[in-house]
Amino acid sequence: MFELSSILIRGGGGVLIVLILLLWIVDENCTDAKAMAYNINCTV
């Protein structure tokens, strides 16, 4: 996860898109978005 984040930070422009995708994935697969934000495992 951290390695991926570093690559995204170096990429710069893709960060916003990735964040939006992550939020969408959390909304689809996780009943509690806050749980995902706090790095608690959600059933996928």
From Swiss-Prot:
Alphabetical UniProt keywords: Early protein, Membrane, Transmembrane, Transmembrane helix
Places the protein is found: Membrane
Protein name: Uncharacterized membrane protein pNG3
Transmembrane segments: 6-26
Source species: African swine fever virus (strain Badajoz 1971 Vero-adapted)
Induction data: Expressed in the early phase of the viral replicative cycle.
Entry GO terms, CC: membrane
Membrane association type: Single-pass membrane protein
Main location: membrane
